[in-house]
C-alpha cells in the first residue's frame, strides 16, 4: 500500500531547493535575514499567520485576540504595520495607535533595537514589524502587497530553517475576526 507524502515533508535547511535558497538570498525582504536574531533559535511553531496593518488603530488588538488555536501547535503571528511617505495623516495616527497598543502588550518584548519586536501571545508568539518610520516606509504604490511579502518572506525563512511545521503561510487582513477552525 502506497501512502501519500505529507507536504510538510518538503526539503528544509541544507536540503532546501536551490530556487528557494536563491529567492531568500536575493529577493527576500531584509527582515527575513534577521528573523533568527529576534526569535529563539530553537523555537518551533505549528502555524504562521501574516497580517499587514495599514491605518487599523487599536482595532487591530480585537483581531489578534480572535486568533484561534492551531491543530499543529503554537502560532507565530507576524504583523507588519506599514505606511508610505504619502499616507494620509489619519493612517499615520492610526498606525501609531496600533504600535502604542501593541507596545503596551510588548512589555518585556525581545527586540533588536530594530523595528522587529516579539512577545508572547495566548496562541504562541506575536512578531511586530514596524514599517512606519523614515527610511522604513514602503515605496509608493507597493502598499499591502509589499507588506504581505515582508511577512511571507519572514515566514518562508523560518519554514526553511525548520521553525514552522505547516507548509502553509496563512495571510489575512487586520480587521478580521477569525473563525475557530481557521487553521484546520
Write out the residue ranges for each language-model feature.
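Short, charged/polar micro-motifs that form catalytic or ligand-binding hotspots
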Residues: 50-54, 137-145, 172-177
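Short alpha-helical segments and helix-capping/turn motifs at coil-helix boundaries
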Residues: 34, 60-65, 111-114, 181-184
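N-proximal low-complexity "stem/linker" segments adjacent to membrane-targeting elements
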Residues: 2-76, 83
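A short acidic (Asp/Glu
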Residues: 60-62, 88-92, 139, 179-183
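Extended hydrophobic secondary-structure segments that form protein cores and membrane-embedded regions
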Residues: 49-50, 78-81, 125-132, 167-177
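Amphipathic alpha-helical scaffolding segments
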Residues: 66-70, 95, 184
